[in-house]
Amino acid sequence: MIIRLHFYYLLTLVYHLGLVGAYEKAARKRIQPPDLIPGPPGHKLGDERPPHYDHRPPYKKHIDNIPAYNLTDLIDDKLLNKYENSCTVNVLTGGFISLASNSWHLRAYNYTLNYPSFLIRCDNGSANPNFSHVLQDFVYDINNKFNVQDDSSKYIGKDPFPLGMIMITFASGCICVATWMLFLVVLLLPSDNHNRRNKVVHVYVLFSAIIRTVFLNETIAVIFDSQYHDDYQDASQFESFIVETAPYKICELVANILSDINWIYIVHYLQSNYGKPTWNWIPFKMKKGTHIIITVGCFLSLADNILFANLLWRKNLVVLKVFYKLIELLIYTIFISIICYFTWHNFAYILLPKTAEINTDGKCKTKLRILWENYHETIPLLAYNILIFILFYFTTIFFAAFTKHVRGWTFNFVHLLKVLITVNVWGLIGVLEKRELHISKKTVLGRKINNRDKFFANPTVNYYGEDLGKHLSAITLNRDLNTTKSNTTSHDSSSLVGSPSPTWKSPIERIRDRRRRHKIMKSENKFGQNPSFGSKSNGKPNTKTTLSKYRQLLRKPRRKTNSYEPKNGIGQNKEGSTVRPGADKHIRDSNYLATDISDNESMETELRTNHIYNYENSD
């Protein structure tokens, strides 16, 4: 803040001391006389008494080396050193002031001070009654004879704006509000979200919000309120009354421990293939991966918290600061590397553009539309997390390199970023898992599978029998590949889920068929044991043939091949047995459906459930 002397107010004060008409004199612009050789004013060596206008500890401020007199030195040399028992100088900060004359009690002068000013008062009742002339001469000298350099800022007791209590209080309030908003977001998340299920995250975020609120209230009540009323700013009081206290240090240490526990839990969750981690605290019974994670995580966390605790109580050790920052950056680098590795290892196939089936027209508009539909949620989320990771690196290094003792409060931003990273990583894992489940539903269940997809089988391979495999191979090899092409994309096929074809049978229908065959077998057994049918020797072979025939039917049926094979290939048996009329009708319908099958598109997949859901609407 640029401090300047209001000479008009000073002349009014001189009038208050008895000079009539002095308040009408206006302050003139200081002009450097051409023949004046600047020189330092006289000063008493060894004078250690504090000036009367120094109501706060001095604060050094850089001033350019200009050959001029300092205003404070002039006041000290011309007034205080000569008349130390009669004159006093005080600093008036900005505000409203009212002046009245001792001789004229009915007349008062009201002024509004926008800048700090000096108030010089001398006692007229002393032995020397000429202080009015002394003050008048002093005002004339500083206006006409000297090039005055204003150095009064060091007596105001006001820090620079980035280090002032206004900035500290504002930043602490923003951090407090942001932490409570994070906790509110965690509470309002759905029940299947990781941030909602994990109680460790709740404890960490809630504890951080509570301690920020408590210390913000303490800062306002103890420091900011008193400094606001006295109109000065002193950041060293915040360091001594808040940061240097034992409760503040203990709370910071506990918050750092909770942060390490959350990060270890995240890494353990990623290593356990996205299942609920099982904690077995007996070392020799732990799994290998869990044992490595717990051992390395506990070692790094212990080293980090020991260095952090020593740094809280011993801030002057530079070597300790360097080791602590190196350990902190090492932990963060390992954590981010593990997050990136497991994200790519487990979710790369849903993040790569190759997995999205592009339409055959090759238009850029179509490709961009498909990419937008697939990645409009994941790409902004990944970019946001990468930005937060980079910001944490920058703030940690910047504050460690350029922060002094009185700026320790700036590390509260680093602590806020730790809380934000913990919540963001759990949110990222949840979004990727949800997308993985959504893509799995769209690509596997209840839709036609494109045989060009590398994740599914080749239809020419014999899966159900030697004869069927040879026949299907002959059909697919003789078919022209360019006659029929799929005109639908994976997105269109997944969004239009149709009802199953008549050739597909659900497990309930299969059970009904088994019961029906079982009843037929019982009736055949009873019919074979009837004496009227024939002799015992003649009926026994027929009964055995019937039993062996229906025992094969009662076995677990594999997928029937009659829906893909022509009538003459399935309707005739090698042993010359005939097919039932119902089965014959079923074969004719299946052959009709099989004639319209493309070589690039197989029939609908057979599901384990009884229904085919429309997953586009079920989300």
Curated annotation (Swiss-Prot):
It is found in: Membrane. Keywords: Membrane, Transmembrane, Transmembrane helix, Zinc. This is Protein DFG16. Induction: Repressed by zinc. InterPro entries: PalH. Residues 485-504, 526-549 have a biased composition (Polar residues). One of its GO terms (biological process) is cellular response to pH. It is a multi-pass membrane protein. Residues 33-54, 485-506, 520-586 are annotated as: Disordered. Residues 1, 189-203, 313-321, 400-410 are extracellular. Residues 44-54 have a biased composition (Basic and acidic residues). GO terms for cellular component: plasma membrane. Residues 552-561 have a biased composition (Basic residues). The chain crosses the membrane at residues 2-22, 168-188, 204-224, 292-312, 322-342, 379-399, 411-431. Its main location: membrane. Involved in invasion during filamentous growth. Residues 23-167, 225-291, 343-378, 432-619 are cytoplasmic. Pfam families: PalH.
